[in-house]
Amino acid sequence: MKQIILTGDRPTGRLHVGHYVGSLKERVALQNSGKFDEIYIMIADAQALTDNAEHPEKVRQNIMNVALDYLACGLDPEKSTLFIQSMIPELTELTFYYMNLVTVSRVQRNPTVKAEIQMRNFEASIPVGFFCYPISQAADITAFRATAVPVGEDQLPMLEQCKEIVHKFNAVYGDTLVDPQIILPKNQACLRLPGIDGKAKMSKSLGNCIYLSDSPEDIRTKVMSMFTDPTHLRREDPGHTEGNPVFIYLDAFCRPEYFPEFLSEYSGLDELKAHYQRGGLGDVKVKKFLNNVLQAELAPIRQRREDWEKRLPDVYEILRVGSETARNTAASTLRDVRHAMRIDYFEDSNLLRKD
């Protein structure tokens, strides 16, 4: 069996460091590992419209933003197929068929759906399209016969629901769909990066993000304003590193080589944490170190983005060709699905037979 990856992001804004450590960095590593035969990276504009139906221009404008961030992070169109979701109409048909295999109560129990509904204040006014997006996501994954899906921790319930749909379809119609495996970040701190305000999730809608394309000054301003340990009021006070966003970011981004370069009085992150915990280390010093770490990590990404911004027609062509390639694959899967369901009526003359 071919080893295939499918993953993607909603184009509702520029991508941030939460996206990067949550899945983008892992995608690039998997792409360059040589272990996968095909890699599909989807810009999920149709999914973005489920809660932006009245603002399609917002979605349209961010297609290129997300594509630029992808290329800047190291996704290579020679190795990965970058495409736009709405350009693949087969995904809509697959979603429609899968809806018959999922109950309303099952979608309501999905923790990710419940959290998103609460965050967007939808409650009883939730759009049907948004409510059904776990089913749409299952169509996205199965259409490309993905064997592996690298995701952040918050998407784990979605992948579990996708696997349920695959199992149900195969049980009813025969072994047709590929059962995908979930790939989570290895670094625990990368599972979910909190917002700079200390909230549990970094979110564009909450305005608590550090974007991959932020200027050096924007990064510095955001880091220096970050929420820390509220009990660490004075430098001499003992502080908590657990649950402290500044240290969570350091866990996610810091490398051993950054200490000799930026904070040579410490041998490593463990020593820095120990000093903070016993007291005598101020938040400003730790934040300055984090700023240096993030500047070093994000500078090459920002430079590559600026280079691609000068080649927008090339980016457009990458998406156009990628969407054509993706559609061919999805069309093949849809033919298999229709055959398994015995609704490929005009593929042979069996429709003329009387049972």
Describe each PLM feature range.
Residues V113-A115, M119-F169, Y173, P194-G195:
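Internal, conserved structured core segments that host functional sites
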Residues P157, K163-D355:
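Conserved nucleotide- and phosphate/pyrophosphate-binding catalytic cores
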Residues M1-Q3, F346-E347:
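Extreme N-terminus of proteins, especially the signal/transit-peptide cleavage junction
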